[in-house]
């Protein structure tokens, strides 16, 4: 049986990542990523929008280790936001704090995020601060808290597999946060994360319930039918309008389900990554649900 740990191991292989960069983008583009850069992803965004699907784009690549590259990523993100507005695309932007220099200098991150959010506020484009591994969780939340007090168009992500997440929701409540709720895709110690899938699922339900009943806009990012049905039933029982939450799924996975949710009247947003560093992202996604492997590779290779 192919396990979650196997895919997480593969995601960290430098050799396989290099191979994927050399030849894989041709296979991945249009299947699991939008393209090698943002401009090449615009036709895909337009196609998704025409089907009633919203989008959030993410320039793949993290763990930047130079201030110069972090500033380049910042300028690229600013240009992406401006292009989204200019092209009238229905899209948010997602980004990781390590791509802006989190592992280099906190002042650099704040400098870069300030520039990005000033542009986002001007164009009314939501910027989602992606969550990474647990060791960076607190710093990421501190950054979100500081900027949420100043800017409207900023959101972040919480992971159900971490023990701390329910308390994090309570701590963020006063900020009226827009949160994307996910199960979690990084390999973590049992000291900080639930080791059993059943416990992760129960905690996921718990945080979905808490965030929605707190009255805050919520993105439920899942491909799990049980979680989708749970959210629908919760909304029905408590009279939560469809415009108070959205579902999110990955580009290239469960496309028909995405369209079905739109037809049912739900908000549906597609997470559309782009860039050459797609391999680690893809392996972590398979680690979330190893049962997706046949479906995923079929989607990558079919015409």
Swiss-Prot record:
EC number(s) from the headed UniProt entry: 1.5.5.2
Gene Ontology terms, MF aspect: FAD binding; proline dehydrogenase activity
Keyword presence, Chloroplast: no
Site (Critical for catalytic activity): 271
Binding site for substrate: 96, 284-285
TM region positions: none
Domain of life where this protein originates: Bacteria
A single GO BP: proline catabolic process to glutamate
Catalytic machinery residues: 130, 180
Binding site for FAD: 131, 159, 183-185, 222-223
The entry's keywords: FAD, Flavoprotein, Nucleotide-binding, Oxidoreductase, Proline metabolism
Induction: The expression of the putBCP operon is induced in a PutR-dependent fashion by very low concentrations of L-proline in the growth medium. CodY represses the operon by displacing PutR from DNA.
Keyword Oxidoreductase: yes
Catalysed reactions, as listed in the record: L-proline + a quinone = (S)-1-pyrroline-5-carboxylate + a quinol + H(+)
Cofactor: FAD
Disruption phenotype: Deletion of the putBCP operon abolishes L-proline utilization.
Pathway: Amino-acid degradation; L-proline degradation into L-glutamate; L-glutamate from L-proline: step 1/2
Pfam family, one: Pro_dh
InterPro entries: FAD-linked_oxidoreductase-like, PRODH_bac_arc, Proline_DH_dom, Proline_oxidase
Protein family (similarity comment): Belongs to the proline dehydrogenase family.
Function: Converts proline to delta-1-pyrroline-5-carboxylate. Important for the use of proline as a sole carbon and energy source or a sole nitrogen source.
Name of the molecule in the record: Proline dehydrogenase 2
Organism of this sequence: Bacillus subtilis (strain 168)
Gene name tied to this protein: putB
């Amino acid at each position: 049986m192919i396990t979650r740990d196997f895919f997480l191991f593969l995601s960290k292989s430098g050799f396989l990542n290099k191979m994927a960069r050399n030849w894989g983008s041709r296979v991945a583009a249009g299947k699991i990523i939008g393209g090698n850069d943002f401009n090449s992803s615009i036709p895909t965004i337009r196609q998704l929008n025409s089907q009633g699907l919203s989008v959030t784009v993410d320039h793949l690549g993290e763990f930047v280790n130079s201030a110069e590259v972090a500033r380049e990523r910042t300028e690229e993100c600013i240009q992406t936001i401006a292009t989204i507005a200019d092209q009238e695309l229905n899209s948010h932007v997602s980004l990781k704090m390590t791509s802006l220099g989190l592992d280099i200098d906190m002042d650099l991150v704040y400098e870069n995020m300030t520039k990005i959010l000033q542009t986002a506020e001007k164009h009314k484009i939501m910027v989602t601060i992606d969550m990474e591994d647990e060791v960076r969780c607190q710093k990421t939340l501190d950054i979100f808290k500081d900027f949420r007090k100043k800017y409207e168009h900023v959101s972040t992500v919480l992971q159900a597999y971490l023990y701390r997440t329910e308390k994090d929701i309570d701590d963020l409540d006063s900020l009226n946060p827009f949160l994307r709720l996910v199960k979690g895709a990084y390999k973590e110690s049992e000291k900080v994360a639930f080791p059993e899938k059943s416990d992760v699922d129960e905690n996921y339900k718990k945080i979905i319930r808490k965030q929605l009943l707190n009255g805050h806009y919520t993105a439920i990012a899942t491909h799990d039918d049980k979680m989708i049905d749970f959210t629908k039933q919760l909304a029905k029982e408590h009279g939560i309008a469809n415009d108070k939450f959205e579902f999110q799924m990955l580009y290239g996975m469960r496309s028909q389900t995405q369209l079905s949710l739109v037809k049912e009247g739900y908000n549906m947003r597609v997470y559309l990554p782009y860039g050459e560093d797609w391999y680690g992202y893809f392996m972590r996604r398979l680690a979330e649900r190893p049962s997706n492997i046949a479906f995923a590779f079929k989607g990558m290779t079919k015409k």
